[in-house]
Amino acid sequence: MIQIFFLGTGAGSPSKKRKLPAFLVRREGLNILLDCGEGTQYTLMNNKLGINSIKIIGITHMHGDHVFGLLGVIASMGLLDRKETLYILGPRDLKDFLYTSFEYSKFNPSFKIEFIDNYNDQNITIATFKTCHTVESQGYLISERDRVKIDEEKLEKEKIKDWRVMRKLKEGKTVEYNGKFLKPEDYLVIKRGLKVAYTGDTIPCQSVIESVKGVDLLIHDSTFLNEPSACTYGHSNVADAAKVALEASVKLLALTHISPRYEDVTEHLKVARRIFPKSILPDDLSYITLK
């Protein structure tokens, strides 16, 4: 199970309804923050989302609406006496930006900060992919590893209830049971891992389409409603995002990075769903659960 909290779904500058980009992804105790617009630390703390529980932060690019909240988040972690290593992914300039800011503000983190290009553990991977914006930018693909599970329905039909047999089958061992040899390949099924992709700011481009194919959730730049000039500014409009979702055969599309010029987004959803019916437009502080 993966939960995605939409902390900030706006763009450029905050509005009454939408804060700046920030998304918290949770999976069984692992907390990943994607982008960190101004005010993110307040949103995390005010909603008891555990600022110090964040293990990994991924920044898509160096525009202020995506990164100006990062210093505050890290400073608050220090004030809360964090000890655990914080892992950060981001553009090449991010490290210099942070450490120069630390130097001028006389801040010395009480914990280790490690800059990484990707992340892997026994349950999940985080990879970057190329996006197409006006500055160096990258998206993030969070993937659960596939898991092997016992076909409990088949075991029940065959009235096999011995947990020792189940354990050996899961270990890939052939088991003799009631005069019959049970082969693991006959009783094991692969549960496909969930995948979540976040583009940050981007025009619709082939590198994004190829990287997000088949994901369970695509969080895509949808800055404008229908302006054909969106690409001129390195952004997508709603139809662009929906076409990417359709071509990439994703399961669900979340429209985000909504320009503050729009108070009513009813038309955004109508436009998106004409092209890609499984589209949503989350409000700030909404969340979804993928299973």
Curated annotation (Swiss-Prot):
Which cofactor(s) does the record list?
Answer: Zn(2+)
Q: Its Gene Ontology molecular function terms?
A: 3'-tRNA processing endoribonuclease activity; zinc ion binding
Q: Which residues form a coiled coil?
A: none
Which EC class is this protein assigned?
hydrolase
Binding sites annotated in the UniProt record for Zn(2+) 2: 65-66, 201, 257
What SUPFAM superfamilies does the record tag this protein with? Metallo-hydrolase/oxidoreductase
Residues that hold Zn(2+) 1 according to the record: 61, 63, 133, 201
Explain how, and how many, cofactor molecules are bound.
Binds 2 Zn(2+) ions.
- Catalytic site: 65 (proton acceptor)
Q: Which reaction does it catalyse?
A: Endonucleolytic cleavage of RNA, removing extra 3' nucleotides from tRNA precursor, generating 3' termini of tRNAs. A 3'-hydroxy group is left at the tRNA terminus and a 5'-phosphoryl group is left at the trailer molecule
The EC number of this protein is 3.1.26.11
Protein keywords? Endonuclease, Hydrolase, Metal-binding, Nuclease, tRNA processing, Zinc
Q: What Gene3D superfamilies is this protein classified in?
A: Ribonuclease Z/Hydroxyacylglutathione hydrolase-like (3.60.15.10)
Record has Hydrolase as a keyword: yes
User: Which family does the record claim for this protein?
Assistant: Belongs to the RNase Z family.
| Subunit structure of this chain's protein | Homodimer.
PANTHER family (alphabetical): ZINC PHOSPHODIESTERASE ELAC PROTEIN 1
Protein role:
Zinc phosphodiesterase, which displays some tRNA 3'-processing endonuclease activity. Probably involved in tRNA maturation, by removing a 3'-trailer from precursor tRNA.
The name this protein goes by in its record:
Ribonuclease Z
